[in-house]
Amino acid sequence: MAMTMRSTRHASKLAQTARLALTNSRRYSTAEPDLKTALKAVIPAKRELFKQVKERSDEVIGEVKVANVIGGMRGLKSMLWEGSVLDPEEGIRFHGKTIKDCQKELPKGTSGTEMLPEAMFWLLLTGQVPSTNQVRAFSRELAEQSHLPQHILDLIKSFPRSMHPMTQLSIAVAALNTESKFAKAYEKGLSKADYWEPTFDDSISLLAKIPRVAALVFRPDEVDQVGTQALDASQDWSYNFAELLGKGGKENQDFHDLLRLYLALHGDHEGGNVSAHATHLVGSALSDPFLSYSAGLLGLAGPLHGLAAQEVLRWILAMQDKIGTKFTDDDVRNYLWDTLKSGRVVPGYGHGVLRKPDPRFQALMDFAATRPDVLANPVFQLVKKNSEIAPAVLTEHGKTKNPHPNVDAASGVLFYHYGFQQPLYYTVTFGVSRALGPLVQLIWDRALGLPIERPKSINLLGLKK
């Protein structure tokens, strides 16, 4: 995006205005607010910033090329997304914070050493790092709102076993809209300025419920037990999710930490990816959060978006079958070339936006580096060796703009190491995580009064002219 010097200075002034308003909203607080109160305090500043930006509606921020239209709108700046910004060179930043910043600053659970995804949700929504006490209270609220209506249990029982887990998850999430406060309030009549509040309530309800729904999909023979299982309100969102999956207890503490890290890392990755954009698109029609995120889940179910982790695992296991556990660098290099020469891609490498190594991949590798049992796993050793050799092979092959590993190159293999060996379910876990970012933006869409999304289309003859 090319901006004039004047526009840059003006943007700087807008940012200063927002920071000043945010500072003023905090100045008179004497007690730690809950999440809704914290959000309510920052909405006026954000609305003022939005108003000032809207006054510049006629300014040009870029150009549209034919490649943008026929290439999936890749690289086209065309939607507002507050929680995160994905830089091709630096990777993802959450309100300006890197993953390492978040790992250092965001509160941890009562056990484990990894940041909590509910703390990430707080940061994404408010731009503020919550205190440990604030996150503990939020975790408690999520546990207390996790119960499901009976019709959801009955619905999941009715699904044929042949139905894909993502189909089940999306249907169940959509069916939860019987609980929507936004839908009920809108039907009765609701001021546009107040749309955000029942949207917030629905979003928290969905965050609280989606781990249990996901666990029911994972454990279809135990719907009645898992559907009514009491959660530990003193524990965090990921801990209770692991309990629902049947992986509780001290013997699974490392898995709990992996789950915390995974859910936090996958929660938001800007707004242009399919699951985030689909949620925003459907939400722009004022569909409630349950219906909106159900649409996002259907996008996530597509093999080009959410299935990469299981494809990596399948490919790595096939690689191990071929070259064994006592492999050489040449064995790995030759297998990579065999994959490419057969017309296939190397799964877990490259990215639609990133042009440098994915910092989420590095975060997972750092996690593994502190676990001797992971480092000793022959399957993980292949992941590590691939990350050392594949970039040079892919660069020589010459058909990728980013030869580096992405987060999927490690996530499925780590799940597999900890006994979570049902690859079809990896995307369901992704779906639990990805709820964080799109729901945050949906709340802000309502708070800022964003309109329904309605781009203009063009046909091939029009482009040819």
UniProtKB/Swiss-Prot annotation:
Residue positions binding CoA? 74, 192, 304, 346, 348-349, 400-401, 406
The EC number(s) this enzyme carries? 2.3.3.5, 2.3.3.16
* Entry GO MF terms: 2-methylcitrate synthase activity; citrate (Si)-synthase activity; citrate synthase activity; identical protein binding
Gene3D superfamilies named in the record: Citrate Synthase, domain 1, Cytochrome P450-Terp, domain 2
What triggers expression?
Answer: Expression is induced by peptone and during infection.
Reactions catalysed, as given in the entry: propanoyl-CoA + oxaloacetate + H2O = (2S,3S)-2-methylcitrate + CoA + H(+); oxaloacetate + acetyl-CoA + H2O = citrate + CoA + H(+)
Q: Which UniProt keywords apply?
A: Mitochondrion, Transferase, Transit peptide, Virulence
The record, for PROSITE patterns, names: CITRATE_SYNTHASE
Q: Where in the cell is it found?
A: Mitochondrion matrix
Q: Name one GO cellular component term.
A: mitochondrial matrix
Q: Does the keyword Nucleotide-binding apply?
A: no
- One GO term of the biological process aspect: propionate catabolic process, 2-methylcitrate cycle
- As listed in the record, the transit peptide stretches over 1-29
Q: Which domain of life is it from?
A: Eukaryota
Q: Which Pfam families match?
A: Citrate_synt (PF00285)
Q: In which pathway does it act?
A: Organic acid metabolism; propanoate degradation
Q: Where does oxaloacetate bind?
A: 269, 351, 360, 434, 454
Q: Which residues form the active site?
A: 305, 351, 408
| PANTHER family documented for this protein | CITRATE SYNTHASE, CITRATE SYNTHASE 3, MITOCHONDRIAL
| Name of the protein this chain belongs to | 2-methylcitrate synthase, mitochondrial
Q: Which organism is it from?
A: Aspergillus fumigatus (strain CBS 144.89 / FGSC A1163 / CEA10)
Gene from which this protein is expressed:
mcsA
